[in-house]
Regions:
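Conserved glycine-rich cofactor-binding loop
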Residues: 10-12
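Residue(s) in the substrate-gating loop at a strand-loop-helix junction
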Residues: 137
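C-terminal helical subdomain
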Residues: 177-178, 197-243
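Conserved glycine-rich Rossmann-like NAD(P)H-binding loop of the short-chain dehydrogenase/reductase
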Residues: 24-40
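Active-site helix of classical SDR
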Residues: 117, 153
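Substrate-binding pocket helix/loop in short-chain dehydrogenase/reductase
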Residues: 92-94, 101-106
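The beta1-alpha1 cofactor-binding region of Rossmann-like NAD(H)/NADP(H)-dependent oxidoreductases
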Residues: 36, 55-66, 99
Length: 249
């Protein structure tokens, strides 16, 4: 049984991954900001395996430290960290973008990943093992119109993942980055601030990736032999060639 910590576990890729690993009887630490969602997930998953839910905002470094430095003994030895929390806010030109949107993306996508990792990595070093999965994006490989700051945050995730592999090379800790293209989740609804019609149009006319597709990939990456590290995966829907070229019918 492995102990797996997942940030952003209340929806989308995080939730799909939590359910997949629960069915494999892993011990789960599920983190998110919405207590009612955490309660719903806990009620479902606790029937299958041991689960601990933690409500905190990854962008609040004091809260991150307080919560993760005081884990119950049963959950204190973390084998796998899945840095999934993050989102996009707005789709505007750089001259018209909202500073609050920029802060939200930088705080969650970059700082949040770093704050959580900074607490967990020393624990992994002590046990001389561990696996960090950073959820990046196709947006970390290219830049698309009006994607400016979101793309910048995902380029940062790519750089951080590479830096982690260098810094942790002698520790026995694996670092993997998974970079999806378009995945049909609440992502666009959050980006467009509840404009459901606009969000739904993002996924019309083609088959987008599903959260379960990414959960399957995470499972594959984690279950490789100890000498194998899948460092980097880019996965797109068949209909998607780049961030802006999508074969819609």
């Amino acid at each position: 049984m492995k102990t797996i910590l997942i940030t952003g576990a209340t929806s989308g890729i995080g939730l799909a991954t939590a359910k997949k690993f629960a069915n494999e009887k892993n011990r789960l630490i599920l983190c998110g900001r919405r207590q009612h969602k955490l309660d719903e997930i806990s009620n479902e998953i606790s029937k299958i395996t041991n689960v601990l839910t933690l409500r905190f905002d990854v962008s609040d470094k004091k809260e991150v430290n307080k919560v993760l430095e005081n884990l119950p003994k049963e959950f204190s030895s973390i084998d796998i960290l899945i840095n999934n929390a993050g989102n996009a806010h707005g789709l505007d030109t750089i001259q018209e973008g909202s500073l609050d949107d920029w802060d939200n993306m930088i705080d969650s996508n970059v700082k949040g990943l770093l704050y959580v990792s900074r607490v967990i990595i020393p624990k992994m070093i002590e046990q001389n093992s561990g696996h960090i999965i950073n959820i990046g994006s196709l947006a970390g490989r290219e830049v698309y119109e009006k994607g400016n700051i979101y793309c910048a945050t995902k380029h940062a995730v790519n750089a951080i993942s590479k830096a982690m592999r260098i810094d942790l090379n002698k520790t026995g800790i694996k670092v993997s980055e998974i970079n999806p293209g378009l995945v049909e989740t609440d992502f666009s609804n959050v980006r467009f601030k509840g404009d459901n019609n606009r969000a739904e149009k993002v996924y019309l006319g083609y088959k987008a990736l599903q959260a379960d597709d990414i959960a399957d990939i995470i499972e594959f990456v984690i279950n490789r032999p100890s000498h194998v590290n899948i460092a980097d995966i880019l996965v797109l829907p068949q209909a998607q060639a780049t961030s802006s070229i999508i074969n819609k019918k």
